Design a protein with these regions (language model features):
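Terminal leader/tail segments of proteins
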Residues: 1-70
Length: 70
């Protein structure tokens, strides 16, 4: 099953069943707070990591830490 952070009507972070975390954008200040809380809650890192993944067009495997192009 996927884990999805949805802010308003937008899927912002998606963690696939095989562990790939993708951030689709940073959007509004409120959404950035949601991203930060989500990353802390699930132990995936922090907002800065999600922002870096988005800006660099990358995805991260939450099981291995591998970061590859999205």
């Amino acid at each position: 099953d996927e884990i999805v952070l949805r802010s308003y009507q937008t899927d912002v972070i998606i963690v696939t069943a095989d562990g790939w975390l993708v951030c689709t954008g940073t959007y509004s200040a409120t959404t950035r707070r949601h991203i930060s809380a989500f990353m802390r809650e699930y132990g995936y890192g922090d907002y800065q990591l999600a922002k870096m993944l988005y800006k660099d067009g990358m995805k991260m495997n939450i099981h291995t830490g591998e970061i590859v192009p999205y």
